[in-house]
Amino acid sequence: MFENLNTALTPKLQASRSFPHLSKPVAPGSAPLGSGEPGGPGLWVGSSQHLKNLGKAMGAKVNDFLRRKEPSSLGSVGVTEINKTAGAQLASGTDAAPEAWLEDERSVLQETFPRLDPPPPITRKRTPRALKTTQDMLISSQPVLSSLEYGTEPSPGQAQDSAPTAQPDVPADASQPEATMEREERGKVLPNGEVSLSVPDLIHKDSQDESKLKMTECRRASSPSLIERNGFKLSLSPISLAESWEDGSPPPQARTSSLDNEGPHPDLLSFE
């Protein structure tokens, strides 16, 4: 019975002897158990451990063999090219091997990916684009009025000239505040003839309105005395006109723009 067991284990032992450095020795406790009890579990435990060790050794050997196999037999897919000169220099033990290998790699990369030439140096400085005048570009800080606006709206000088001719009976001191208000509303006249419109002050708007109301009240207080002195009447209805004609008084003249503009909010920009 022992002879049969020994003959059965001989091929496995021979296989294990072929890899003495890879296989592990069988546990020493398994031999006396196997010899003492041939049919006991100790023999099977030792044989299974031996098979496990053999499988590990064979797997490691196969993996090592596949890893060391020549790359030419595996094909060109997924295989890196081996630099033979670098391998020879590494085998000889020279220190210049890494530098030569890097130079070879750089040459290969330059061949596969050609390096582009650098852009030419900029010799001429880029000049800005020539802009038009501010009047054409409409970006001037002082807006320029067109000829149509000049034609429709008279200048402040013309308005001042027309005011005394339209109302010759009104003295000059009464027309001065109106001219100053017109100047403020219309804007300042520049030396080149352009009119710069004044920007309305929205913050101090209430104070400006109060000052305008005071000016109009002053003119109202002064205007009735002038009208009564000159014989004018405020109401120009047909009845009043007939009565004034019967009394022999001269017919009332046409009301000027200054009288029409008198009100809670005088519009000094409209000239009739």
Curated annotation (Swiss-Prot):
Residues 1-17, 155-165 have a biased composition (Polar residues). Keywords: Phosphoprotein. It holds the Pfam family DUF4628. Residues 1-47, 111-130, 147-272 are annotated as: Disordered. The modification Phosphoserine is found at residues 222-223, 249, 258. Residues 202-220 have a biased composition (Basic and acidic residues). This is Uncharacterized protein C1orf226. The gene is C1orf226.
